From Swiss-Prot:
The lineage of its organism: Eukaryota, Metazoa, Chordata, Craniata, Vertebrata. This is Disintegrin trigramin-gamma. Inhibits fibrinogen interaction with platelets. Acts by binding to alpha-IIb/beta-3 (ITGA2B/ITGB3) on the platelet surface and inhibits aggregation induced by ADP, thrombin, platelet-activating factor and collagen. It comes from the Eukaryota. It is found in: Secreted. PROSITE patterns: DISINTEGRIN_1, DISINTEGRIN_2. PANTHER family: ADAM A DISINTEGRIN AND METALLOPROTEASE DOMAIN, ADAM METALLOPROTEASE. One of its GO terms (molecular function) is toxin activity. The disintegrin belongs to the medium disintegrin subfamily. A motif (Cell attachment site) lies at residues 51-53. InterPro entries: Disintegrin_CS, Disintegrin_dom, Disintegrin_dom_sf. Monomer (disintegrin).
Amino acid sequence: EAGEDCDCGSPANPCCDAATCKLLPGAQCGEGLCCDQCSFMKKGTICRRARGDDLDDYCNGISAGCPRNPLHA
């Protein structure tokens, strides 16, 4: 939601302060296909495997989301 860095609905998230919905100091992310142990996964890590004649999607190293491969048809 607006103003929140992470989902504070789960107090078990080790990257998020459940009271403030803000990332803990040193954490880059709290969730997402390209977030691993509170850090962005390195650029080029596959975050979504291809299905059919689709292409793999890769982490970009600067966000927790899994951006769509720009070469998709």
